[in-house]
């Protein structure tokens, strides 16, 4: 009986030691997809405020973008690397937080090593994120080139 009580007490203590999720204060930013073929030809930030704008974007690119998510009070932000001549390029989410009136998002840009064997094909990597529709004046995406980039609230 004493062992069971000690075990339960130890488990309660350990449950308080669980690591925080990587987004921390930026829990309001949700990664929808990280794609290698979005179809956006130039590096940049694209903001879609509703499903109609998202459908217009999907119709204008030769790529694979996810469906509009059913998330209230959220817009979609696409951070794009543009066309790349080979495979092996990518962009991933690191963290997000508020910096005054700015929504600041940190990304990790990856490229193949110079001596890596990669597929010779055009790719267009991007990161699709759901961000809050209000409460910020500017969104800033930070990381290696082509970032940092900013986009004002419309």
Predicted features along the sequence, with ranges:
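N-terminal secretory signal peptides that target proteins for export/translocation
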Residues: 1-2
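Bacterial N-terminal signal peptides
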Residues: 5-15
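Exposed, flexible binding/inhibitory loops of compact, secreted disulfide-stabilized domains
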Residues: 17-154
């Amino acid at each position: 009986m004493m062992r069971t009580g000690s075990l339960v007490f130890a488990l309660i203590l350990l449950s308080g030691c669980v690591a925080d999720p990587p987004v921390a204060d930026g829990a309001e930013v949700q990664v929808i997809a990280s794609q290698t073929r979005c179809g956006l030809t130039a590096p940049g930030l694209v903001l879609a405020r509703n499903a109609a704008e998202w459908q217009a974007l999907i119709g204008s690119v030769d790529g694979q973008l996810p469906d509009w998510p059913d998330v209230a009070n959220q817009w979609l932000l696409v951070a794009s690397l543009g066309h790349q001549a080979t495979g092996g390029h990518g962009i991933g989410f690191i963290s997000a937080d508020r910096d005054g009136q700015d929504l600041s998002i940190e990304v990790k840009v990856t490229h193949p090593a110079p001596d890596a064997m990669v597929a010779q094909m055009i790719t267009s990597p991007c990161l699709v994120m759901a961000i809050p529709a209000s409460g910020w004046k500017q969104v800033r995406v930070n990381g290696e080139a082509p970032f940092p980039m900013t986009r004002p609230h419309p």
